Amino acid sequence: MNNVTNIVRRKSTRIYIGNVPIGDGAPIAVQSMVNTRTTDILETVTQINALKKAGVDIVRISIPTMDAAEAFKIIKQQVINTPLVADIHFDYRIALKVAEYGADCLRINPGNIGNNKRIRSVVHCAQDKNISIRIGVNSGSLERDLQKKYDGNPTENVLLESAMRHVDILDKLNFHQFKVSVKSSDVLITIQAYRALASKIDQPLHIGLTEAGALRNGTVKSAMAVGFLLNEGIGDTIRISLATDPIEEVKVAFDILRALRIRAHGINFIACPGCARQEFNVINVVNALEEKVSDITTPMDVSIIGCVVNGPGEALKSTIGVAGARNKSGIYEDGIRQKKRCDNISIIEELERRIRAKSKLLDPNNHNITPTTYNK
């Protein structure tokens, strides 16, 4: 694979969420959100650690009550080296409390956080604690006056007006450590809203399609919206919102970044769908291998082709590849065909062995490593 992207990133200011740089050319950060009850500290910490193992850069936690804020205090003490974004709605006092407890970023929703006085209180607190803010506009919870103005139709214009209203507030307060999102559940509205916002401000943008749906449908819609924006150079952090295990959100996010050659993380599988020419069951091999090496974060290309039509050509471009042949298939490593062929019944085991050996060689300390970038 050509590991250099031609995408020109939109210029933006630099902020930090914990120790993670955002914007101004920093690697695009992957964010997810726990779906546990925050007051269940053990379950929440367990899920955060699982997300971290999957490669997540930033984790968001919903803080709906003061009890949740108190739980957040303990969670923050137990989570090491993973920045936590506190998701705040309705009660601005919760934002003040979690900022005191070490939140790395405050997500506020302009549609329900309250009047300007309350927003100023949150901003002053963030300034005192030197933490960032995300202005998180969402099509499902816009301000009442904007809903009335636009007859309840959450178009890109409504999202943009809501965002700019609060950008102006933060600017007037001389607060610049913030990023902005304008999410809709509609792919085209999301794209149009972010395009418009990107042309008006230079703050980092957090991109995503809100409430995208279940795994398959949500992945397709998110890939369309997020991939389209990334290809235009728009986006500094991403979150794929799926109604499934949040680990899948992280996987899909990295799949999108890898497909656009923006950020390499884990294995890029190249595999044929299988046909009458296949000499081994490609589908079974791919599915089994993908599961077995899901813990590998070292970037590499692995091609699994069931016959000699395209197999050798793909293998020559891959880190590790197999080209199907009768009884024994050809194995390639770094574009070189290996002298010893592999029994077709042992392909899964042989490829896993080679992948793990290559991962250890390329990155001896491969244990939830910080993902690399293609264009770093």
Swiss-Prot record:
<dbReference type="GO" id="GO:0046429">
    <property type="term" value="F:4-hydroxy-3-methylbut-2-en-1-yl diphosphate synthase activity (ferredoxin)"/>
</dbReference>
<feature type="binding site">
    <location>
        <position position="275"/>
    </location>
    <ligand>
        <name>[4Fe-4S] cluster</name>
    </ligand>
</feature>
<dbReference type="GO" id="GO:0005506">
    <property type="term" value="F:iron ion binding"/>
</dbReference>
<dbReference type="GO" id="GO:0016114">
    <property type="term" value="P:terpenoid biosynthetic process"/>
</dbReference>
<keyword id="KW-0408">Iron</keyword>
<keyword id="KW-0560">Oxidoreductase</keyword>
<comment type="pathway">
    <text>Isoprenoid biosynthesis; isopentenyl diphosphate biosynthesis via DXP pathway; isopentenyl diphosphate from 1-deoxy-D-xylulose 5-phosphate: step 5/6.</text>
</comment>
<dbReference type="InterPro" id="IPR004588">
    <property type="entry name" value="IspG_bac-typ"/>
</dbReference>
<comment type="similarity">
    <text>Belongs to the IspG family.</text>
</comment>
<comment type="function">
    <text>Converts 2C-methyl-D-erythritol 2,4-cyclodiphosphate (ME-2,4cPP) into 1-hydroxy-2-methyl-2-(E)-butenyl 4-diphosphate.</text>
</comment>
<dbReference type="GO" id="GO:0141197">
    <property type="term" value="F:4-hydroxy-3-methylbut-2-enyl-diphosphate synthase activity (flavodoxin)"/>
</dbReference>
<dbReference type="GO" id="GO:0019288">
    <property type="term" value="P:isopentenyl diphosphate biosynthetic process, methylerythritol 4-phosphate pathway"/>
</dbReference>
<dbReference type="InterPro" id="IPR045854">
    <property type="entry name" value="NO2/SO3_Rdtase_4Fe4S_sf"/>
</dbReference>
<feature type="binding site">
    <location>
        <position position="307"/>
    </location>
    <ligand>
        <name>[4Fe-4S] cluster</name>
    </ligand>
</feature>
<feature type="binding site">
    <location>
        <position position="272"/>
    </location>
    <ligand>
        <name>[4Fe-4S] cluster</name>
    </ligand>
</feature>
<dbReference type="InterPro" id="IPR011005">
    <property type="entry name" value="Dihydropteroate_synth-like_sf"/>
</dbReference>
<feature type="binding site">
    <location>
        <position position="314"/>
    </location>
    <ligand>
        <name>[4Fe-4S] cluster</name>
    </ligand>
</feature>
<dbReference type="GO" id="GO:0051539">
    <property type="term" value="F:4 iron, 4 sulfur cluster binding"/>
</dbReference>
<dbReference type="Pfam" id="PF04551">
    <property type="entry name" value="GcpE"/>
</dbReference>
<keyword id="KW-0479">Metal-binding</keyword>
<keyword id="KW-0414">Isoprene biosynthesis</keyword>
<protein>
    <recommendedName>
        <fullName>4-hydroxy-3-methylbut-2-en-1-yl diphosphate synthase (flavodoxin)</fullName>
        <ecNumber>1.17.7.3</ecNumber>
    </recommendedName>
</protein>
<keyword id="KW-0004">4Fe-4S</keyword>
<dbReference type="InterPro" id="IPR016425">
    <property type="entry name" value="IspG_bac"/>
</dbReference>
<keyword id="KW-0411">Iron-sulfur</keyword>
